[in-house]
């Protein structure tokens, strides 16, 4: 059963007439076509029995076909109203939609209103939970792509460390990393690259700028790539030239927490218990107040996807899941340490896809 058939089967079981899928990530998952439509409408209609159809800007219809979509494509010009074309397509097929599964968390109010009109007042139900479950367990090809993306993330850290010299700015190092990764053929970075020096490393989502590197700084890299539609995400922290005892204690605590959470990752383990494992180590060391975020997040087509690796999550790990483990400690006036790996759950336990060394390195 292919992915479209799987959605059709779910619609039939749930009693929903159809699904309208519009996010670029889920469109890619179901069609193999990856694009950024910006403000233009892109959407996929899937039914219980009828043939699906795909609506997209006409200038991208050929790319969708080349990506492997072998069902109908309704391409539209910029002067045309795609909602009118959708309404005509449904009427032509004599399809009356009563219950329509949509990505309710991401569709705008304006588009929801236009979709409701085009479908003759269909009642909306959520498609997110089901699509998240479909994407949760990665197949062999997805694991292969995630491994390749992880290797390139490792390479990005390698480039970053090689670029370091006293007085260089965060943005100069960032530019070198992204330039070298682009030369490797990536689609793009999976999120805004972070290169943070000194006290700025203590900002969990800091913005690189003109801060320059000096002796005794922590250097934090957080980066990832998109390769053939799949993402990676790695964080490594280094000391530059020297390290004081407090910095070293922080680093070793984070490293111990990260390793323990990876070791605990096995099928059947509650996700929340991974967070609690890492958090317990950090709290015991006296830094509990300085670990302000969850342990990690799901990883795949999106750099942040289901599941959330928080202590409140009762979901049990399954073979084929991929997610990040990224504990951190962030202390004002000292800086921060975060260590992050992409983790694949196998029947025997967890395998880290990112492989860059993570024992303390003084550069």
UniProtKB/Swiss-Prot annotation:
CDD domains (alphabetical): APP-like
GO biological process, one term: proteolysis
One Pfam family recorded for the sequence: Peptidase_M24
EC code: 3.4.13.-
Binding site for Mn(2+) 1: 233, 297, 326, 340
Cofactor(s) listed in the protein's UniProt record: Mn(2+)
Binding site for Mn(2+) 2: 222, 233, 340
Record key words, sorted: Dipeptidase, Hydrolase, Manganese, Metal-binding, Metalloprotease, Protease
Cofactor binding comment, as recorded: Binds 2 manganese ions per subunit.
InterPro entries named in the record: Creatin/AminoP/Spt16_N (IPR029149), Creatinase/aminopeptidase-like (IPR036005), Creatinase_N (IPR000587), Pept_M24 (IPR000994), Pept_M24_MAP (IPR001714), Peptidase_M24B (IPR050659), Peptidase_M24B_aminopep-P_CS (IPR001131)
Record's keyword annotation contains Aminoacyl-tRNA synthetase: no
Protein name (record): Putative dipeptidase YkvY
Originating organism: Bacillus subtilis (strain 168)
Encoding gene, per UniProt annotation: ykvY
């Amino acid at each position: 059963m292919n992915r479209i058939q799987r959605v059709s089967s779910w619609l039939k079981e749930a009693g929903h007439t159809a699904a309208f899928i519009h996010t670029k990530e889920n469109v890619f998952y179901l069609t193999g076509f990856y694009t950024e439509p910006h403000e233009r409408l892109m959407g996929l209609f899937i039914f219980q029995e009828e043939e699906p159809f795909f609506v997209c800007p006409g200038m991208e219809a050929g790319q969708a076909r080349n990506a492997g979509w072998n069902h109908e494509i309704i391409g539209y010009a910029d002067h045309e109203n795609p909602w009118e074309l959708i309404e005509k397509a449904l009427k032509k097929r004599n399809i009356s939609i009563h219950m329509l599964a949509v990505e309710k968390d991401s569709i705008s109010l304006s588009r929801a209103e236009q979709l409701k009109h085009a479908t003759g007042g269909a009642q909306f139900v959520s498609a997110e939970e089901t699509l998240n479950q479909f994407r949760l367990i990665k197949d062999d090809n997805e694991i292969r792509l995630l491994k390749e993306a992880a290797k390139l993330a490792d390479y990005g850290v390698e480039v970053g460390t090689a670029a370091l010299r006293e007085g260089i700015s965060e943005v100069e190092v960032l530019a070198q990393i992204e330039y070298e990764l682009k030369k490797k053929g990536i689609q793009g970075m999976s999120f805004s690259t972070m290169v943070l020096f000194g006290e700025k490393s203590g900002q969990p989502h800091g913005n690189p700028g003109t801060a320059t590197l000096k002796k005794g700084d922590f250097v934090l890299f957080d980066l990832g790539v998109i390769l053939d539609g799949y993402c990676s995400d790695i964080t490594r922290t280094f000391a530059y030239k020297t390290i004081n005892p407090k910095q070293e204690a922080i680093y070793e605590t984070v490293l111990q927490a990260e390793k323990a959470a990876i070791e605990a990752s096995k099928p059947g383990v509650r996700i929340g218990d991974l967070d609690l494992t890492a958090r317990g180590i950090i709290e015991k060391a006296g830094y509990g107040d300085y670990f302000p975020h969850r342990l990690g997040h799901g990883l795949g087509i999106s750099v942040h996807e289901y599941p959330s690796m928080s202590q409140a999550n009762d979901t049990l790990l399954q073979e084929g899941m991929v997610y990040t483990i990224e504990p951190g400690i962030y202390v004002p006036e000292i800086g921060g340490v975060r260590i992050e790996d992409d983790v694949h759950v196998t029947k025997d336990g967890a395998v880290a896809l990112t492989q860059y060394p993570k024992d303390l390195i003084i550069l």
